[in-house]
Structures are given as C-alpha cells and as structure tokens.
Design a protein with these regions (language model features):
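Short, surface-exposed loop/helix-turn segments at secondary-structure junctions
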Residues: 95-103
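Conserved long hydrophobic alpha-helices within structured protein cores
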Residues: 27, 80-82, 105-115
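Outer-membrane beta-barrel domain signature
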Residues: 19-23, 56-61, 102-106, 143-149
C-alpha cells in the first residue's frame, strides 16, 4: 500500500517528465518461476509468470498486470543459443500536452521473440566472444506520440580480454 504514490508524467513532444503525487494506491499479486536443466546442462528452460492487481492502473505507469517470459538455452561446446519469448498485457501512462490537459495513453499488449547466438573462445591468457542477437523477430512494433517502440533490432558484438 502506498500513501503518497509518486508517478512520472510525460510532457508530450519533449523528453521531459515531472513527478506528481497520485495519492493512495495499492498493488498486490504474485511472481512464479520455473526452471529445468538437463543433467549435462546442454539444455535449460526457464519460465516466469507474474500477475498483479492494482487499485488504479494509472498509479503504476507502464506496469503490465500480466507478464510471461520463457527462455530456452542450448549449450554445445563453445556455442550458446538463447531463444526468448516475452508476453506482456497492455500498459497505461499519463502524459500532458502543451495546453496542460492530462492525456491517458494505452500501449497494446506485446508478444515478442528474441534470439541470441554467442561463441566464447579461450586461448592462453586471451578470452574472446562473438555474439549475434535479434530482438523482436516477429516485428511487432508500437508507436507512441510519434516514437516507435519495440522495433526489430539486430546486434553484432565482439569482445576480447587479456589476463
């Protein structure tokens, strides 16, 4: 229970937020986690589920009431592959426009898939890593006040370290 819940209000059109006192608000719910690994740890599965009840969803901005995250990991020698599924219910937040009017905004539920492939090598005192990842592979994008959210992205990373 919160007696003086502070929430951030986004000023429309600029990257500025300011706090306001929302007053009384409460949040309850539960989180659950499940994990399974093969004996040799070549395969791992983990799943998380969260469910929340809000006295007022606008008091807890951008907080979904339901979240599911599943992750499958395969490890074979130097390679590791992660496959990730994330699902979140709709989210709400408050913004204010240039005339001072409060706007109640809603982001639709999301359901995304990500993948990451990494290679780790060791040679004497050197360690190297290469990873390639893709986010939001199903390309479900959202737009908020002209700003694109959850875009499909690809990353290639290299790392080298020496003892």
């Amino acid at each position: 229970h919160y007696s003086n819940k502070i929430k951030q209000v986004q000023l429309t059109g600029v990257p500025i937020q300011f706090p306001i006192n929302f007053g009384e608000a409460s949040l309850s719910g539960f989180d659950s986690n499940l994990s399974f690994s093969s004996k040799a740890e070549l395969f791992n599965f983990s799943s998380s589920y969260a469910y929340y009840l809000f006295s007022d969803p606008m008091a807890f901005q951008l907080q979904p009431d339901k979240m599911v995250r599943n992750k499958i990991t395969f490890k074979i020698r130097w390679f590791q592959l992660n496959l990730i599924h994330r699902s979140e219910s709709d989210r709400q937040f408050t913004s204010i426009n240039s005339t001072g009017t409060f706007l109640h905004n809603r982001l639709d539920a999301i359901n995304t898939y990500d993948a990451n492939l990494s290679l780790k090598l060791k040679f004497r005192d050197y360690k190297g890593a290469i990873s390639f990842s893709g986010k939001n592979l199903n390309n479900i994008s959202q737009e908020l006040n002209g700003i694109s959210l959850y875009d499909q992205r690809y990353n290639l990373n290299f790392g080298l370290s020496w003892k």
